UniProtKB/Swiss-Prot annotation:
Annotated localization: Cytoplasm
Keyword Cytoplasm among record annotations: yes
Record: active site: 170 (acyl-thioester intermediate)
Enzyme class: transferase
Protein name per Swiss-Prot or TrEMBL: Octanoyltransferase
InterPro entries, sorted: aa-tRNA-synth_II/BPL/LPL (IPR045864), BPL_LPL_catalytic (IPR004143), Octanoyltransferase (IPR000544), Octanoyltransferase_CS (IPR020605)
Pathway in which this enzyme or protein is active: Protein modification; protein lipoylation via endogenous pathway; protein N(6)-(lipoyl)lysine from octanoyl-[acyl-carrier-protein]: step 1/2
Entry similarity comment: Belongs to the LipB family.
Species whose genome carries this gene: Oleidesulfovibrio alaskensis (strain ATCC BAA-1058 / DSM 17464 / G20)
Length: 218
């Protein structure tokens, strides 16, 4: 696995990079993990989400917030500086469990990353992503083309998650967003620090995928 740090780039640019790499990985190139941030953008998944947006597009545009329809699974979510985004462009063909196992492994990466900061996070049946009690700290939405994954996860690191106030998070009225800094009550934790830990956990998890990922995918 090669890991590439893209810095903070627009959403559309990241999609273009991923789709280009999908073709290469599907043809035999090395699996690639992109780590990055996005400027403020609200995205909709294949399950919809515009009905869960509480602000019109013109108001968002005046605030410098983009809106984008995507090919990933899931509903509505937000991206912004201070949120760690990870896009795994990985071959799925031949992997035990396929996409469901990949999803489980992505959750595992985040759970282990948060544990390194002293936080106990968990999966919630029927509520994709990673949670701390009823607070969502990480959204996950993936897609597949030519048996290769793209899109991925978004882990809230910095305390300010106010962009989520403009949406019903993933269409769940009882859910609210949280962040690593807020849960640790420590604003000194940097995104780079979390990025480094997350990269290490990606390598560990995908070197030895969790058994439950295979069991849950059949």
């Amino acid at each position: 696995m090669q890991i590439i740090d893209l810095g903070c780039i627009p959403y559309a640019e990241a999609v273009e990079i991923q789709t280009g790499r999908v073709q290469e990985v599907a043809a035999g190139a090395e699996n690639t993990l992109y780590l990055l941030e996005h400027p403020k953008v609200i995205t909709f998944g294949r399950n919809g989400g515009r009905e869960n947006l509480h602000v019109d597009d013109s108001t968002l545009a005046s605030m410098g917030i983009e809106v984008a329809q995507t090919t990933r699974g899931g509903n509505i979510t937000c991206h912004f500086p201070g949120q760690l985004v990870a896009y795994p462009v990985f071959r799925i063909a031949g992997r035990p469990g396929g996409m469901r196992a990949l999803f489980y492994s992505l959750e595992e990466v985040v759970i282990r990353t948060l544990a390194r900061f002293g936080l106990q996070a968990f999966r919630s049946e029927g509520r994709p992503g990673v949670w701390i009690e009823n607070r969502k700290i990480c959204s996950i939405g993936i897609a597949m083309r030519r048996w290769t994954s793209y899109h991925g996860l978004a882990l809230n690191v910095c305390r300010d998650v106010s962009l989520f106030d403009m949406i019903t998070l993933c269409g769940l009225t009882d859910a609210r967003a949280t962040s690593l800094q807020a849960e640790c009550n420590d604003d000194s934790i940097t995104l780079q620090e979390v990025k480094d830990v997350c990269a290490g956990e990606f390598r560990a998890v995908f070197a030895h995928p969790p058994v439950a990922a295979h069991q849950n995918s059949v």
